[in-house]
A protein has these predicted regions:
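Bacterial lipoprotein signal-peptidase II cleavage site
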Residues: 18-37
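Sec-dependent N-terminal signal peptides of Gram-positive bacterial secreted proteins and lipoproteins
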Residues: 3-23
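Flexible, active-site-adjacent loop/turn segments at secondary-structure boundaries
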Residues: 2, 145, 253-254
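Pocket-lining segment of extracytoplasmic ligand-binding domains
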Residues: 113-114, 122, 196-280
Length: 280
């Protein structure tokens, strides 16, 4: 993977953000659009007269890209949300894409590279409204301290999730930038979900894996022989001139054009949900 790829990805995301008019701020844990950017567009009074009374159908992946969404449901139960939400969680991005394309979802929290691909394939029909996740990927080593740099991964087997999505592209890019051929110099075993990776690590001596938070912390609590060997955000910053964006929230353009007030109200709720997640 060339450095140009990362630049094009960032450009595609920037274009989609600009096209939808929803610039956003974010944090490494999980972040969404700043409430300051949208609060004036969706006050509580406006939320009572939204252009649709249907629940906003939104999907997310199990993991960091959806952490900022989880408090929407409790907000809805408490009467603090601007609308009703139908939030569905999936184990893999390829489960979400067809639902989004067929109009069975209104929004989704997905890997950044997938968002860029969908933006291009749909000619802007799928657009980003918020960056929800920055750098949350780590190399974790079990029972040793042999991995001190990307170069130390040469010749090793690496367990990972996210084949065809951000984790794969980030890992391959970083390996290549450090002189390691990801197809010849390492063996990468992909699993559908992070929980499958942690289960495999438990049964493998000297295992090495790429995991996102919060799974890194959860795995460490279950096995005290695990250690964080590398922060892939730090490794990215050493070789790339773009920020590492791993997840974004997207909306169907048709839905955004028909219900701009709903999108604005969602972003306000989203910001509150993220704030609660970061506080918890």
């Amino acid at each position: 993977m060339k450095k140009l790829t990362s630049v094009l990805l960032a450009l595609a995301l920037a274009l989609s953000l600009a096209a939808c008019g929803g610039a956003a701020s974010s944090s490494t844990a999980s972040s969404a659009a700043s409430g300051e950017a949208v609060s004036e567009a969706a006050s509580s009074e406006e939320a009572k007269e939204l252009s649709t009374t249907d629940a906003l159908r939104i999907a997310g992946l199990k993991g960091p890209t959806t952490m900022g969404l989880v408090n929407l449901l409790s907000m809805e139960e408490d009467g603090a949300a601007s609308m009703d939400y139908d939030l569905q969680l999936y184990g893999a991005a390829d489960e979400i894409v067809p639902l989004l394309m067929k109009g069975e979802l209104d929004m989704a929290a997905i890997p950044a590279n997938l968002a860029a691909t969908l933006y291009q394939k749909t000619e802007g029909g799928i657009q980003a409204v918020a960056v929800n996740t920055l750098g949350v990927l780590y190399v974790v080593e079990k029972g040793g301290d042999t991995v001190q740099s990307m170069a130390d991964l040469a010749g090793r087997t690496i367990l990972s999730t996210g084949k065809g999505t951000t984790p794969e592209y980030v890992l391959r890019y970083l390996l290549a930038q450090n002189g390691i051929d990801p197809d010849k110099d390492v063996t990468i075993e992909y699993y559908s979900e992070a929980t499958e990776v942690t289960a495999q690590m438990a049964n493998t001596e000297d295992a090495i894996a790429v995991l996102p938070q919060p799974y890194v912390t959860a795995a460490g609590l279950q096995d005290d022989t695990l250690r964080v060997a590398l922060d892939l955000t730090e490794e990215w910053n050493k070789v790339a001139d773009t920020q590492l964006i791993t997840g974004v929230t997207v909306v169907r353009k048709e839905y955004a054009e028909e219900h701009p007030d709903v999108v604005a109200a969602f972003l306000t709720d989203y910001a509150k949900s993220v704030e609660a997640a970061n506080t918890d």
